Amino acid sequence: MKEEKIKVNLRVGLLIRETLVDEAAVEDIRVGTLANRLLQTEMDKVMKVGADNCLIMNSREYLASEAEIEQNRADYYLFPETKVVSRFIATQLDDKIYPQISFYFLKEQMDALEKLVRKQRIPQTIRNGAVHSYRYVIAGMLLNHPLCRVLGASANND
C-alpha cells in the first residue's frame, strides 16, 4: 500500500513559473509534475542532511558555522538568503496570471518542512504557533535545483 501524501498548494513567482513552463513544454509533461519532480530531488537532499544542517546563506547560524560548512559541505543544505527568495515568490499581480501548483509530500517530509519553517523564523509563515506557509522553504529548494539555477539565486552548487 502506498503511503498517503499531503498536498500543499503554492503559487511560485513569475520567473520560477516561466522556467517550469518552458521545461515542461520541452519534456511534454505538466508543470505540476515537473515542479514536484524537481522539489523531490531537493527534498531528498534535505532529508539526507536533516533539518538541523539546513541553513540560510549569510544567516547568523551560517556565519557561525562557515568554517565547518566549508570542510564538510556534503553534510549541509544551504538555502538562498530570505531577501533573495522573496524576489521569486508570487505577488498579487502574479496570482491573476499563474494558478497554484500542488506539491505532494510524505508525512516525514512534511515534518522536515515544518522544522525548516520554524527554524527560518520568517514573519508571516507561522501564525498562532502553527505553520501557515511553506513558500520560502519550497521556493528556496526550487531555486537550488539545477534547472532553476539560471535565475542566479541558488545557494548550492553541487
Question: Model-predicted segments: where are they?
Answer:
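Conserved small-residue-rich
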Residues: 81, 87-125, 135
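Short, basic amphipathic alpha-helical segments that act as recognition/interaction helices
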Residues: 26-55, 125-158
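Short amphipathic alpha-helix starts
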Residues: 4-21, 58-59, 63-64, 98-118
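Short, positively charged interaction helices/loops
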Residues: 45-96, 147-158
